[in-house]
Structure formats: C-alpha cells, structure tokens
C-alpha cells in the first residue's frame, strides 16, 4: 500500500518506517511511506509555507500554493506506483473521529495522501479543492497533524494482509467486531496475590472462547456502553449470553 505524507517534519515518520510492526512492513515492501515537505515547493529565499490570516487573529495559516504542489507531486508518485484510488486525507480536529470501521475501509484503498497541518491550520481553499476526507483522532488539539497521521498509518498497516506475524491477533483486537478486548494474562501464575483465571489454564478451547467473549461483552457494557447497540452477535454468542443470564 502506498502512503504519501505531506509534512514539515518528515523525520518524525521514522517512528513508522523504522520500528515495530509498521517498520517491518516497510522493510518487506508491503507498504511504501514517502514524506513530502511542502517547503520544497515554496517560493522565495526563505521558502515560506505560512502567512498571517486574513481578517486578523493569532498565529499563522499554512499557504495553499505549496501544499497544492506537494499534493500534486504525491499524486504523480502514486500514479507511478500503479495506484488508482488514492484519496487525500487531512488530519484535523474538525474531522470525523477515526474508528475501526473507517480503518477497515482505508485498507481497501490503493493508498493514501495524508496532509499534516500546523499552526492555525491550512487555507480553506486548499481543503475545498484538494482534500477528500477530514479525520480526527479525538476532541483535543495537538501541535500538528503528524501524530494523528502516524496513528492513522499504524492502524491501517497492522490490518494489511501478511503484516502481522499472527493475523489472529489483529482479528481479536478491541473494536474489530465492536467489542473491547478481553483481559489478557501471561506468566507467572500468581502476581502480588492475584491469580490467572483457572479456565485459561484448562486447555478447554471452547470454554475459553466462551469466557473471553463474556468478558469482552461485560467489559464493553461497563466501559463503553454506547458500543453495545452497534454490535451484531452471532447465534453462538447470543446463546452464551442467554446461558449466563439464566
């Protein structure tokens, strides 16, 4: 999958391309992550990419022209890589909140061009003409779009085929089917007076699967009750709940 990131700080994305699951995917050429600095497309000796906002106010606004040139360059790179469906995504606190359903849709794309804002944001005309989607990672403000972009890339990359060494791990993550994950345990059997649930050491896989589902359902009900209404249960899961509730 092809990713082009429009950013003033390309070095930050070493965290994606050099480490962990996403780093391994990059080394195996499952993903291609290219960072494009809009300063390379700016005019003048100082290569400015920001200016004061019209109408006054604090801070600076990123200029449309260098960003547009950077995006067009990214589209050319995507085309050379054989990509057809490559939307431009702007990471913005005004965007829709990223969730697992959105991530699953991104996985089906050929690639993404991700625009990282800075300062007070970007010229609205750039958004109107070049941005296909706006996404946020939560109702709070960060110094720039780089960290949200890394969250987006990491969440997509781990869902791509052949990225996870154990693909079942990705399937069982929180939110994949709408429920939170179940409690996880490893050695030792006892830690500060707390024991691993006996059922997890029983070797009875059907009972373990039932226990894990009930734990996930109860945890979601307690911590994120608004998610329960969106969950579609299997026939077996409905039976487990019915048995548990008597």
Swiss-Prot record:
It catalyses: guanosine(37) in tRNA + S-adenosyl-L-methionine = N(1)-methylguanosine(37) in tRNA + S-adenosyl-L-homocysteine + H(+). It comes from Acinetobacter baumannii (strain AYE). SUPFAM superfamilies: alpha/beta knot. Belongs to the RNA methyltransferase TrmD family. Its main location: cytoplasm. The keyword Lipid biosynthesis does not apply. One of its GO terms (cellular component) is cytosol. CDD domains: TrmD-like (cd18080). Coiled coil: none annotated. GO terms for biological process: tRNA N1-guanine methylation. Keywords: Cytoplasm, Methyltransferase, S-adenosyl-L-methionine, Transferase, tRNA processing. One of its GO terms (molecular function) is tRNA (guanine(37)-N1)-methyltransferase activity. This is tRNA (guanine-N(1)-)-methyltransferase. The lineage of its organism: Bacteria, Pseudomonadati, Pseudomonadota, Gammaproteobacteria, Moraxellales. S-adenosyl-L-methionine binds at residues 117, 137-142. PANTHER family: TRNA (GUANINE-N(1)-)-METHYLTRANSFERASE.
